[in-house]
């Protein structure tokens, strides 16, 4: 297991927050073999990858697939382009073919973001097929599901899709397990892996913890605050047991450790319990 602190956004760069995350992981019995690696300290690695996707460097030509994008967030949300299944917009290619003079004129007003071209819908290279370990066969046509996507924001912050692909590739990650809200990111990440020459890991997505109204639980709303639960229960067994029982890996009310769950884990079982887990007054004992 590789521990990576995904703190690309300057607002997320908090040593105290990282310390609390690691403390909570240890308390839950989740240890790691490598890290922690901080994305905020890897900007040069990401910049090199973007150069390879774009014009390249002297003596090492790139793929020529990136271009500057001047669209604002409000313009993108106001556009009539369709939206993908995860709610994000499908980029309409507004800035895709700007000439050099227009790029220079707009750049004088504000810095652009960097966007990556995807193949046309008719091009087989833009159709991504893979098998998720829980949700089975998946297919996405990049041109119709997302369009050209960001690899760097206008403020210079590297996009999540690019950063995790570079990190997974450079760190030798072979399996990625995460919430199913990121299932729609797989095709973009696999496209980047193929362009950059990285091995494609296996992906497994798991259910989310949601409120009774279906809202995804969030740290911002202090939903199911782990600090409060630590004070209430003292040990992690009841919490792990509550989650594991909803996934078919434990009996209702059973207290288990992370080590005990290792021997019980099965993707086949997870696939049969792939619905989101509702957290209400009956969730914890």
Where are these regions (language model features)?
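A short, terminal or domain-edge coil/loop segment
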Residues: 53-68, 123-130, 135, 253-273
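Short C-terminal domain-edge/linker segments immediately following a structured domain
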Residues: 32-36, 147, 193-196, 207-208, ...
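Active-site cores that bind ATP or allylic diphosphates and position pyrophosphate for catalysis
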Residues: 62, 74-219, 225-230, 279, ...
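Non-catalytic terminal extensions that flank enzyme cores
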Residues: 104-105, 121-123, 215-220, 224-285
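N-terminal Rossmann-like or analogous alpha/beta NTP/dinucleotide-binding catalytic cores
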Residues: 1-86, 180-181, 185-198, 255-258
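Short amphipathic alpha-helical segments, especially helix-boundary/capping motifs
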Residues: 1, 23-29, 49, 162-169, ...
């Amino acid at each position: 297991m590789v521990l990576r602190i995904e703190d690309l956004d300057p607002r997320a760069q908090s040593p105290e927050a990282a310390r609390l995350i690691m403390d909570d992981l240890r308390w839950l019995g989740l240890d790691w073999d490598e890290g922690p690696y901080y994305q905020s300290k890897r900007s040069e690695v990401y910049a090199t990858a973007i150069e390879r996707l774009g014009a390249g460097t002297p003596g090492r030509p790139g793929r020529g697939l990136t271009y500057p994008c001047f669209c604002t967030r409000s313009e993108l949300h106001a556009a009539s382009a369709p939206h993908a299944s995860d709610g994000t917009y499908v980029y309409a290619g507004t800035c895709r073919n700007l000439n050099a003079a227009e790029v220079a004129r707009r750049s004088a007003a504000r810095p652009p973001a960097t966007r990556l071209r995807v193949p046309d819908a008719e091009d087989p290279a833009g159709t991504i097929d893979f098998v998720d370990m829980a949700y089975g066969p998946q297919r996405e046509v990049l041109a119709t599901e997302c369009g050209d996507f960001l690899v760097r924001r206008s403020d210079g912050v590297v996009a999540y899709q690019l950063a995790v692909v570079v990190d997974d590739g450079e760190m030798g990650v072979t399996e990625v397990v995460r919430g199913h809200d990121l299932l729609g990111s797989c095709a973009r990440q696999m496209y980047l892996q193929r362009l950059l020459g990285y091995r494609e890991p296996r992906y497994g997505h798991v259910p989310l913890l949601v409120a009774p109204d279906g809202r995804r639980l969030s740290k911002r709303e202090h939903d199911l605050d782990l600090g409060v639960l630590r004070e209430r229960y003292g040990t992690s067994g009841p919490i792990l047991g509550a989650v594991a029982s909803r996934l078919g890996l434990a009996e209702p009310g059973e207290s288990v450790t992370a080590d005990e769950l290792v021997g019980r884990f099965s993707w086949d079982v997870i696939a049969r319990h792939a619905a989101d887990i509702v957290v209400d007054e009956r969730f914890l004992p």
